[in-house]
Structure formats: structure tokens, C-alpha cells
A protein has these predicted regions:
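Mature extracytoplasmic or organellar-lumen-exposed domains after removal of signal/transit peptides
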Residues: 1-25, 31-126
Length: 126
């Protein structure tokens, strides 16, 4: 889901860059729509992290608790993804999308077990 949002953000960045410099009304309208699309999908990434992973799935671990380091690592990855999604809203630099995909992959590897990762891969193929 987040990977699809990031792919859409990257496509929007490409379209905005392609239309840059044009001043006719239709091009300006298309740019506005692509900016809205880009920002909407970046917001989707942030909301998925906040409302699903941080609020529901990632359980807080106190210092000394088993699994504390994994909790810290996952929380840091999610924070990085929230920040890079924000930066995607502010720019058309596609390297931000590449960074976001890398963070998603790192989080996926940390969050899911081997069975879950295999299931995700099978969904992408099918």
C-alpha cells in the first residue's frame, strides 16, 4: 500500500517536472492536479504510519523490556518515513521517493517475519 503511494508520488513528480514552464491554462490545471495527487499520497503514507502502525501495531516497550531495541528501531524507521513523506510534499526531487522505498523495505524486513515477507512478495506478483 505505501509502496503504491510512493510510486504515485514519483509519477506525480515526473508529470509536474514535464509540465514545468508551461503557462497555458490546461497545463497549469494539470500541474495543480498533480501537486494535489502528490500531496494526497504523501499524506496517505503518513496517516498509515500514524493510524495503523504507531497507534495499533507497534506496541510500546519500556527500557529493559524484551524487544525494546526492535521497538526503537521500528519507531525510528517510521519517523524517518514520516519525514521523507513530508519532504515529498515540499519538492519534486524523486530521490526522496527512492529514500522512502528504502525505508519501507527496511521496515518491512524488521516488522514482518519470513512468512509475512513471502506473503507480501506473492501479493506483488499476483
Amino acid at each position: 500500500h505505501m509502496e503504491e503511494d510512493i510510486a504515485t508520488i514519483k509519477k506525480a513528480m515526473t508529470k509536474i517536472s514535464d509540465l514545468a514552464g508551461r503557462t497555458d491554462a490546461q497545463s497549469l490545471n494539470q500541474i495543480a492536479r498533480w501537486v494535489t495527487t502528490k500531496e494526497s499520497h504523501a499524506q496517505n503514507v503518513q496517516e498509515t504510519i500514524l493510524n495503523y502502525f504507531l497507534a495499533q501495531r507497534i506496541k510500546e516497550k519500556q527500557k529493559g523490556d524484551e524487544g525494546r531495541q526492535k521497538y526503537v528501531d521500528q519507531t525510528l524507521l517510521l519517523h524517518q518515513l514520516i519525514v521523507v513523506a513530508m519532504k515529498c510534499k515540499q519538492t519534486v526531487d524523486q530521490s526522496r521517493c527512492d529514500a522512502a522505498l528504502k525505508i519501507v523495505q527496511n521496515f518491512t524486513n524488521s516488522y514482518f517475519d519470513d512468512h509475512g515477507i513471502d506473503h507480501i512478495k506473492s501479493l506483488k506478483k499476483g
